[in-house]
Curated annotation (Swiss-Prot):
Residues 25-91 form the BTB domain. The gene is Zbtb49. GO terms for molecular function: DNA-binding transcription factor binding; sequence-specific DNA binding; transcription coactivator binding; zinc ion binding. SMART domains: BTB, ZnF_C2H2. This is Zinc finger and BTB domain-containing protein 49. PANTHER family: AGAP004733-PA (PTHR46105), ZINC FINGER AND BTB DOMAIN CONTAINING 49 (PTHR46105:SF30). Belongs to the krueppel C2H2-type zinc-finger protein family. It comes from Mus musculus (Mouse). Residues 176-197, 226-290, 311-379 are annotated as: Disordered. Interacts with EP300, KAT5/Tip60 and ZBTB17. The interaction with EP300 is direct and leads to synergistic induction of CDKN1A. On the CDKN1A promoter, forms a complex with ZBTB17; this interaction leads to additive CDKN1A transactivation. The interaction with ZBTB17 may block ZBTB17 repressor activity. Keywords: Activator, Cell cycle, Cytoplasm, DNA-binding, Metal-binding, Nucleus, Repeat, Transcription, Transcription regulation, Zinc, Zinc-finger. Residues 226-242 have a biased composition (Polar residues). It comes from the Eukaryota. Transcription factor. Inhibits cell proliferation by activating either CDKN1A/p21 transcription or RB1 transcription. A zinc finger (C2H2-type) spans 386-408, 414-436, 442-464, 470-492, 498-520, 526-548, 554-576.
Length: 756
């Protein structure tokens, strides 16, 4: 087997398996609630319609396309053909397949349908509404008009059934004009057309305005009753309507005007006017005028997006340099109608109506003609809006309105076959299924992170820019997307309607209650793939994984420090705010010049009696008595140092924090001579006895008298105290500060021993 063929088969098989499994499918076609997953590349390769649709909607975020087509089987069979190259055609589905292929512009399916029609006799095609007209020539005209630039001419030339015209009864000749009242002479007079069909594609104009006309006729074909089809031809007035009703008794393919407007049947005369030789122009002219009038019907808007109307007038003028009178009139009418559509001029429309002659006015007087025939300016009206009956929101398409109504009714017809969750739209179900399969086709171009939905990528990109356009009205906090803002606003509400069944705790959000219940159950379904540690919430797992990867996505704008959690970053930013608010006060105090009054105030405000309060308990041991010289010597070496330590450790009761801040700089800024010359003070008891041991009671009295003297001396300001020399000469026994502290500790120890 050819390696290229093997390679192609393998590629096609893999694409088909991916479509069946729903993997890597980047679009979804929704037809009457039925979802068809597919690949855009495959659809664009086979369908010119999808190629233009995808190219013109490249900026579209949604990958779900709603096709309002009545028959679902036609879409499904064409998709199967794209992925398998097999198409099952029979007399029952040939009409559906031909209609759908014409709408979607699938050239391969059109070729197969035409081949099937060529091989099948006209009498064996019950699905066709008009056996004579459609089977003989309309197929060729359809193929020529819709896809004339790509369709091979030989297949078009062989479309008519060979030799049926001599055997066609007279009723067939009457039936053909009923469905196609612009071509009665071609069926009844084959000699006028030369008796051969190969000339038809040669003289048939290959302009895109005819394809536009094909879609334009669908609105009329759906709304108009078959019995109300105009029958202006005098020789075929009543028999045509009767035969048409019999022909339309077979079930046609119904359609609605939507994104894709599927016709009930596709006779060629609703596509374009027929082509004749110049032999019978006088008979063909009055009967060829109504199609020019039909071209003023509703236009399919999506064809304008495909640029099919861009250069139709110029191409029409250069295509046939020598047209006959009937063709010239039809082309002139079409050109005038296009000018009216583009410029909105009604004067040109009236002029074109006048050139159509009496047959045009007779056609307008027909009973049952739709309003679009009588009012040519209807095509220029804005597109119809479909408003919701409950909230009044307008929509351009009825299918979008139906989807919107589900938000009011709560209907969720789409169910996940894995977890059973229901959704109101098929696109939401598709995004949900990706979470089960793990497929993440959307990638962030900045960091490379992958997402399952396109909307998640758009919300993620805002994180890199740091933009938070959605602000809370209550607290002013900003959010990158509106959904997070809605969740945040619930935290400000006092209503707590979600209550835990086990502990009775209430919450204002459902997700908080679900997270709280995990604490009761102890369930930890989220495990770390690196270390195996389990967590109760997915957010906890994400934060834990950052400890392995080292990712710190939250950075401070002030110092550029990065953090793994947003809460830590918020606390860090508060530190910058406190420092900025406190720094001016401290710097102002330090920069203020030092005044002498500050020094005096600081000295007078500090009192040793206010700082230290010593309570001594009775002791049962003898206290050691030291001479005055040793006491004074010990005090001179330690008194000033211990006093400075106590002063720095203790604070006066009435001093505030601000006063302390204002005093400390002044202490630091004292002159060197004040700090280098500490004054020494000696303390002793009032009794003049020295060096004599006293009884236990006498020792206790000495200690108490010494403490009383110390307390009296500490009440004096430092500046008014006498020098220590006076105490050295007049006082005898003295207890240093360390001795007093030791005495107090010993007293407490003895008291504890007595209690034991």
């Amino acid at each position: 087997m050819d390696p290229v063929a093997v390679h192609s088969c393998h590629l096609l098989q893999q694409l088909r398996e991916q479509r069946i499994q729903g993997l890597l499918c980047d679009c979804m076609l929704v037809v009457r609630g039925v979802c068809f997953k597919a690949h855009k590349n495959v659809l664009a390769a086979f369908s010119q319609y999808f190629r233009s649709l995808f190219q013109n909607s490249s900026s579209q975020k949604n990958d779900v396309f709603h096709l309002d087509v009545t028959n679902v089987s036609g879409i499904g069979q064409i998709l199967d053909f794209m992925y398998t190259s097999r198409l099952d055609l029979n007399q029952d589905n040939i009409q559906v397949m031909l209609d759908t292929a014409q709408c979607l512009q699938v050239q391969n399916v059109l070729n197969l349908c035409h081949t099937f029609l060529k091989s099948a006799p006209a009498a064996q095609l019950p699905g066709l509404p008009c056996a004579g007209g459609f089977s003989l020539q309309s197929v060729a005209l359809d193929g020529t008009c819709a896809v004339s630039e790509h369709y091979p001419p030989p297949s078009l030339q062989e479309c008519p059934v060979e030799g049926p015209q001599a055997k066609v009864p007279a009723e067939v000749n009457a039936r053909a004009p009923s469905a196609n009242f612009s071509r009665p002479t071609e069926v009844s007079k084959p000699d006028a057309a030369g008796g051969s069909c190969p000339e038809l594609p040669c003289k048939q104009p290959n302009h895109y305005y005819k394809l536009r006309t094909l879609y334009s006729k669908q609105y009329y074909k759906q709304t108009a009753c078959p019995s109300q089809v105009p029958a202006t031809q005098q020789p075929l007035t009543r028999s045509a309507s009767t035969d048409l009703a019999a022909a339309d008794s077979q079930p046609p393919v119904e359609g609605r005007p939507a994104v894709l407007e599927t016709p009930e049947h596709l006779p060629s005369t609703f596509v374009a006017p027929p082509v004749r030789n110049s032999g019978n122009d006088s008979e063909a002219d009055p009967l060829s005028e109504p199609p020019a009038k039909q071209m003023r019907l509703k236009k399919a808007m999506h064809l304008k997006k495909l640029n099919f109307l861009k250069s139709q007038q110029s191409a029409e003028c250069t295509s046939h340099p020598e047209p006959d009178n009937g063709l010239a009139r039809r082309e002139e009418s079409a050109a005038k109608e296009d000018a009216v559509e583009r410029a909105g001029s009604q004067t040109a429309e009236e002029k074109g109506r006048g050139e159509l002659g009496p047959e045009s006015s007779r056609e307008e007087e027909l009973p049952g003609a739709p309003a679009s025939w009588e009012d040519p300016s209807q095509a220029l009206q804005p597109q119809k809006q479909y408003a919701c009956e409950l909230c009044g929101k307008p929509f351009k398409h009825p299918s979008n309105l139906e989807l919107h109504k589900r938000s009011h009714t709560g209907e969720k017809p789409f169910e996940c076959n894995i977890c059973g969750k229901h959704f109101s739209q098929a696109g939401n179900l598709q995004t949900h299924l990706r979470r089960h399969s793990g497929e993440k086709p959307y990638i962030c171009e900045i960091c490379g992170k992958r997402f399952a939905a396109s909307g998640d990528v758009q919300r993620h990109i805002i994180i890199h820019s740091g933009e938070k356009p959605h602000l809370c009205d209550t607290c002013g906090r900003g959010f990158s997307n509106f959904s997070n803002l809605k969740e945040h606003k619930k935290t400000h509400t006092a209503d707590k309607v979600f209550t835990c069944d086990e502990c009775g705790k209430s919450f204002n959000m459902q997700r908080k209650l679900v997270k709280h219940r995990v604490r009761h159950t102890g369930e930890r379904p989220y495990s770390c793939p690196a270390c195996g540690k389990c967590f109760g919430g997915s957010g906890d797992l994400r934060r834990h994984v950052r400890t392995h990867t080292g990712e710190k996505p939250y950075s401070c704008e002030v110092c550029s420090k990065c953090f793994t959690r947003s809460a830590v970053l918020r606390r860090h930013k508060r530190m910058h705010g406190r420092a900025d608010a406190r720094s001016p006060v401290v710097l102002g105090e330090l920069s203020r010049p030092i005044e002498p009054s500050d020094l005096d105030r600081s000295q007078s405000s500090d009192s040793f009696s206010q700082d230290v309060s010593v309570t001594l308990m009775p002791v049962s041991v003898k206290l050691p008595v030291q001479p005055v010289e040793s006491s004074v010597a010990g005090f001179d070496g330690h008194c000033s140092g211990s006093y400075c330590k106590l002063r720095s450790m203790l604070r006066p009761p009435g001093m505030s924090d601000q006063d302390r801040l204002s005093l400390e700089p002044s202490k630091l800024a004292k002159p060197p001579e004040l700090q280098s010359q500490p004054q020494a003070y000696a303390y002793s008891d009032v009794e003049p006895s020295a060096g004599v041991e006293q009884p236990q009671a006498d020792g206790m009295a000495v200690s108490r008298s010494s403490l009383a003297t110390l307390d009296n001396h500490c009440t004096e300001p430092l500046g008014s105290r006498a020098p220590s020399v006076t105490y050295r000469n007049s006082e005898g026994q003295f207890f240093s500060s360390m001795t007093l502290w030791g005495l107090a500790m010993k007293t407490l120890q003895n008291e504890h021993e007595l209690e034991q």
